[in-house]
């Protein structure tokens, strides 16, 4: 089970990541936004696998109508994701956010 502190630790261990508020929530930026707390216990990350993740584990990965126009964003329930999986998600999100 991951926590917001785990997210912070992993994000800030990645190259050139900064933390600041976005829409009143903690967020982490590479060149662009790479991760943001959506609400308590739910994290937004960038991925190329949104449909696969949500299709295989909908209790962990999902999106809302707000995210329909952003197919690279997925929401993650932190209490359902293992630490190693969280790290993989954040590393991919970092790569995607660093490309711009």
Regions found by a protein language model. Name each.
Residues 1-100:
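Charge-dense, helix-prone N-terminal extensions
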């Amino acid at each position: 089970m991951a926590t917001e502190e785990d997210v912070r630790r992993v994000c800030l261990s990645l190259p050139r990541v900064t933390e600041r508020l976005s829409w009143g929530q903690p967020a982490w930026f590479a060149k662009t936004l790479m991760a943001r707390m959506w609400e308590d216990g739910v994290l937004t990350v960038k991925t190329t696998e949104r449909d696969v993740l949500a299709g295989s584990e909908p209790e962990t990965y999902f999106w809302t109508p707000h995210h329909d126009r952003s197919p690279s964003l997925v929401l993650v329930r932190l209490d359902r994701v293992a630490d190693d999986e969280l790290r993989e998600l954040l590393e991919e999100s970092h790569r995607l956010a660093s490309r711009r």
